[in-house]
């Protein structure tokens, strides 16, 4: 697990903090770059710390390569490249990568499209075979049927990410007003659905031929490779692909606003008003981009930020806000976003933003403020390259958009070189007294909250209708097969499976019943540790749910010796992150820090734990913000579905509640409730410590001795709540969200605890049903029907029984059919799977272990499970034995025992006017109508 191929001059990189004269960073990732005759740029990075390889291909084509009337093509091809190519069958791309034990995905933005895989090293040739086939041999499979199927998937993605959520249309409204109609940033990445519907196959194919050639891409192969052998494989699979047109890179196209534009939208999902202000700035390569990056944090990040001081603290207009610089390839914007309280007038917010700007001008900031931001940037930078895929992304991005992988160091140095005058200069140039685009989002019927001078911006709302048949057009073109110099239909054989090397886990027992678990991981100068205190919501008073949650928010607001601002600055100065949060069964502290700052960061954690401030002013603010957050989530269909499903399964058990509580329960809580909880329940004997990173066992054990010594062991009483019995008969439930563009589906029942002997076997059994992209439910509902952006099933468990859940968000007018498809697939899953499917399941599970412990987060997650559930250090091997020993017969026995659709809860959250009636077709009687809190509507 020792990663010695990442060449970093730590001393040079880290000296900048607190120095007046910034040294030039000597940061470097070792790589070899070359180009094929067809123009494909290839970058190889060797890293033998784990037996895995990542492949990332950055195509220089995003929505900015499109034209008005022909938008959404780049995003469409992101989807279509996963479907089929000339030598790889329908839906086989995902299956073949998963069968090799790998993971994969892709993404599109305004400037580019990236595809990636991470696989055990023996499957590299398979990845290159697949990637080359869709780069050079895709067009013969781009049919009208495939095109229309992915149109449906894209529309469902838009419904899920934009149409069916609060404030979803914000970006669309902003860019339509920021950029002229001919500007490549005038449309969203997902595009106009009308453009895709009106596009012909000729249009789509022409776009592909123009932009997806090898000469418009950078491919990075990083990991446990032999460079010479890899070069030969690259030449074999990619060398004969014909280049596309030599299109020039886009030039910067900054915009200027001749006036401030203010627009508004009535949002049926919003419960609180939101204001955004966007100022036009510069492209990502511009010299001013680095200073704008830090300006965004200075204005809005933290309690010292002027936007926070004026809007949150002084005027109490909003519980939260943020500001940031968003530079892209050809233009950029500087954004301020404020989500107010339900009655906040957005005109007051706009005025407060300008008042905060004036405060920034008069109060200014110091070099120390900049140094704290640079420390945070440094830690974030290290985290971004903590995996071979992370390094692959960075190398590909900087090569494609900045001309060289070495630009990663240049851009890093730009941030380190920013000084006070740079930040003041960009503020004066781009923000002060400049025109901007402002969006107002207000709850439906609350036009009194919009800022003066705002005009309605029309949004095309999809009409909700009852079930309709999908109309499939005809018009497939006959395209000749594309020749190759060898038989590409033959999948290469993977080499020997790499041996699983489990990390060496250690444990030390202190006095008082507290233990520390750890593992060394010295690939980067980082340390990650956590403290878990058993209890969480389980120890809340049932009438005051939310106490534990408020504790973890309030304890981060200063200590007895530090004000909230002083604590925040102390953490930032170290470049560390300290997060405290509550779950249903525990309170947790999560810490990430540079190795050299581990001890002072741990000292701050001790101070937070044992010297709380109990600031009454901060308590009132957090309580108010929590209530507002609960109200906001009550309008989000996905949140409603999860919360109601939980209540239906857990009944009167305390686990039926959300850890944040309800509006009523939080309103009843006072600060003494928090103090009493901590004094009674924060106990050493209920706590465990987990630590991974560049630290030895002895250093870790010694470092925590002081913390353990200060911690008292107590007797803590847990209420013995009776776990409800699972359903014996299926029931259908419906929550009405009028005009919802999608229906949220949750189907399932109360199942097993994490410690049940069958739990892990069930997760394996579930794989083919819906445990990954190639699962049956996703293949039918997404790939075959085009009803959803994704469908899944899974078992969730802890020390208490969890749920088996089947879930999806489907197009509203497919609700009835989708729920019945779920039911049918689960019913027929009891027919034995064949040996091929079982082998696929085993491969997905076993082979993926090669990439399981690459990062600090993954490793500490494993250690946390060991500590929480008292698992053997090598429990992974026990799990592997379960997989290897599974037969078709034993798999089927698990299905019959644990997948029982006639005993499940069927919940839909959607538009009752058009979809409620269809739920009767399930055969479980009339659906029971519930409100958003899970109460029966009478």
Residue ranges with predicted function:
Residues 18-42, 226-267, 409-532, 690, ...:
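Proteolytic maturation boundary segments
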Residues 144, 151, 205-237, 435, ...:
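Non-catalytic, conformational "gating/processing" segments within enzyme and secreted inhibitor domains
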Residues 154-161, 253-266, 374-384, 593-594, ...:
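Short, conserved secondary-structure transition motifs
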Residues 144-146, 151, 157-158, 165-174, ...:
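Hydrophobic, small-residue-rich alpha-helical packing segments that form membrane-like cores
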Residues 8-16:
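Bacterial N-terminal signal peptides
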Residues 45, 50-66, 72-76, 90-137, ...:
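M16 family metallopeptidases and their MPP-like homologs
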Residues 1-5:
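Positively charged n-region of N-terminal signal peptides that target proteins for export
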